[in-house]
C-alpha cells in the first residue's frame, strides 16, 4: 500500500485551515483546552459535566479568568517544526533568562503547502499585532493568517 503524500498534505492543510489541532509528544502536557480554543461554544469541553484529570484547573480558568494564549494560524517561508517556540522580543512576556527569551507560544501542527509552511500555534493573545519570530528573537518571521 502506497500513501499519497500529496493527499496527506491536503488533509493536514484542511485541518490547519479549520483550526483542528493534533497533539504530539513534543506538545503534550503543555496545553489546556482554552489554548486550543476548545472552550469556545464548548465544542471540545463541557463545563457542566464529567470528571477528568485537570478538570479543576480547566474549569477555574473558564469561570474565573481568561485564556492568555489561544490558537492561531500562521505561515512562513522558513521551515517549521512541531514544538518550535514563537517569540516576540518586544513583548512584556519575553523575559530574558541569560541570553534567551521566554517563548510566547508553541507550534502544534505544520505542513508545507504551495511552497510555504503553514502551522497552528498557540500565542499570547496580546501579541497578535506584533512581529512574531521562530525559535529566538532573531529567527524567521511568521505571519498570522487568521485568528478564529
Locations of regions flagged by a protein language model:
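Helix N-cap / beta->alpha transition motif
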Residues: 1, 24, 122-126
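Short, well-ordered alpha-helical segments in soluble proteins
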Residues: 3, 20-24, 40, 65
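Glycine-rich, small/acidic residue-mixed loop/short-helix segments
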Residues: 36-43, 59-148
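A short, contiguous structural element within a folded domain that forms the immediate neighborhood
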Residues: 24-49, 57-61
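Acidic, low-complexity central loop/insert segments
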Residues: 1-21
Amino acid at each position: 500500500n502506497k500513501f499519497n503524500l500529496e493527499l496527506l498534505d491536503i488533509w493536514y492543510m484542511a485541518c490547519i485551515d479549520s483550526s483542528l489541532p493534533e497533539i504530539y509528544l513534543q506538545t503534550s502536557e503543555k496545553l489546556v483546552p482554552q489554548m486550543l480554543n476548545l472552550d469556545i461554544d464548548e465544542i471540545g469541553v463541557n463545563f457542566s459535566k464529567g470528571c477528568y484529570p485537570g478538570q479543576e484547573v480547566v474549569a477555574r480558568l473558564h469561570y474565573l479568568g481568561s485564556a492568555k494564549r489561544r490558537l492561531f494560524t500562521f505561515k512562513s517561508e522558513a521551515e517549521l517544526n512541531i514544538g518550535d517556540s514563537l517569540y516576540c522580543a518586544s513583548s512584556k512576556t519575553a523575559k530574558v533568562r541569560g541570553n534567551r527569551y521566554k517563548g510566547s507560544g508553541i507550534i502544534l501542527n505544520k505542513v508545507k503547502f504551495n511552497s510555504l509552511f503553514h502551522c497552528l500555534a498557540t500565542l499570547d493573545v496580546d501579541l497578535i499585532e506584533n512581529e512574531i519570530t521562530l525559535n529566538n528573537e532573531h529567527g524567521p518571521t511568521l505571519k498570522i493568517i487568521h485568528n478564529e
